[in-house]
Design a protein with these regions (language model features):
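Membrane-proximal helix-turn-helix segments that form the acceptor-binding/catalytic region
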Residues: 95-114
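Nucleotide-activated donor-binding/catalytic signature segment of Leloir-type glycosyltransferases, i.e.
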Residues: 208-231
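Conserved acidic donor-binding segment of nucleotide-sugar-dependent glycosyltransferases
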Residues: 280-291, 298-305
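Aromatic "clamp/platform" in nucleotide-sugar-dependent glycosyltransferases that forms part
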Residues: 248
Length: 356
């Protein structure tokens, strides 16, 4: 058996969570001992033993699914996107959202099975009536790369000119209302003694008026650092004093796993996607609005709240790429793609199978 992770359109999603998920799949499958191939094989015995992973909903992806099926391959379609997390993303996204949902349904129906990263996103996709088995499986986290490292932290603080004792709060994501950027700016305005740094960016042509106004009016203690690579981002997780993820809608949030793996105190918005796996006061702190974010951040930065480092790192470790690779094997076996005798002994599979 072999696996082809289809990379059509990869350059368009490389800097997004979908791009990270694609790389995580490759590493997870390698850890499970499954061979990866670069191209969908031609019709024949090799194709019949090949599983093709699709991660985007770009036009080339359903075409690749059709080509894979015609050659005898099985197709796993990853449900990273929903209409719900498409809204409030860029200029015109709310108007296009209903059409985007119809396109998602068409794409996901091209898979023999669908994998989505959370119980919450699975519930949404079940409501789309896709008609294919839908499994829940985290995108995973490379805990060998993302882990606490004081030297990395010192490098981050030196790079951004943070004096000893200077508090710093970071966030990561595209410049979107959905990602909570306006609230991040408001927090900075309320906490002028704290440095706020936002990593990530969006093409300026796609920005909404609300985002433009928020960024233009941002106080001097806010830095929009733009997109940075994994090395620099890991440095930031290791050196900042808190990670605030204010997103209003997610299917999982890989950056949350990265932060937890690095042991940084983390606060997230109290939204449904986290209900089944992030517990307030045990692995993260949660807040429902800007006032709560401000109050809890102040307490976190001043040492008035207990450290949740161990609980957060345990959440990340349970979703290490080694665990994800074994869970993928079990999904293949359930889907009839792989002899069950070849799969590893079952741990927590993070999977569920029902027809949408």
């Amino acid at each position: 058996m072999s696996v082809c992770i289809y990379r059509g359109g990869y350059q368009m999603v490389r800097k997004s969570g979908v791009g990270k998920a694609l790389e995580h799949q490759a590493a997870a499958l390698k850890s499970a001992g499954l061979p990866l191939i670069d191209q969908i094989p031609p019709a024949g015995p090799e194709a019949k033993e090949c599983v093709v992973h699709l991660n985007t909903v770009l036009p080339s992806a359903p075409l690749a699914a059709a080509r894979a099926h015609a050659r005898g391959c099985k197709v796993v379609y990853y449900g990273h996107s929903t209409m719900e997390d498409f809204r409030n993303s860029f200029f015109g996204s709310n108007l296009l959202a209903p059409l985007f949902k119809r396109w998602l349904i068409f794409c996901y129906r091209q898979g023999d099975v669908v994998i989505t990263p959370s119980v919450y996103s699975r519930r949404i996709l079940m409501g789309y009536k896709i008609g294919k088995p839908i499994y829940t499986l985290s995108n995973g986290i490379d805990t060998g790369f993302f882990h606490p490292d004081p030297a990395r932290g010192a490098r981050f603080r030196d790079r951004y000119g943070l004096a000893e004792g200077q508090k710093c709060v970071i966030s990561v994501g595209h410049w979107m209302v959905r990602k909570g950027l306006p609230d991040f700016v408001e927090l900075a305005r309320r906490m002028p003694e704290v440095r706020f740094i936002w990593f990530g960016q969006t093409d300026e042509a796609l920005l909404t008026d609300e985002i433009r106004k928020a960024m233009e009016a941002a106080p001097g203690n806010v830095l929009f650092a733009g997109y940075v690579g994994a090395e620099d981002l890991c440095d930031a997780y290791c050196g900042a004093d808190a990670f605030a993820f204010l997103s209003h809608e997610e299917t999982e949030g890989i950056v949350v796993l990265e932060a937890l793996a690095c042991g940084i105190p983390t606060i997230v918005r109290d939204i449904p996607v986290y209900a089944n796996w992030l517990e307030d006061g045990k692995s993260v702190y949660k807040a429902a609005n800007v006032n709560q974010f401000e109050a809890k951040l102040r307490d976190m930065l001043n040492g008035h709240l207990p450290s949740l480092k161990e609980g957060g790192m345990a959440v990340a470790e349970a979703r290490s790429l080694g665990q994800i690779g074994q869970a993928l094997c079990r999904i293949y076996a359930s889907g009839g793609f792989l002899d069950a005798a070849m799969t590893a002994p079952a741990a927590d599979t993070h999977t569920a199978r029902k027809r949408a």
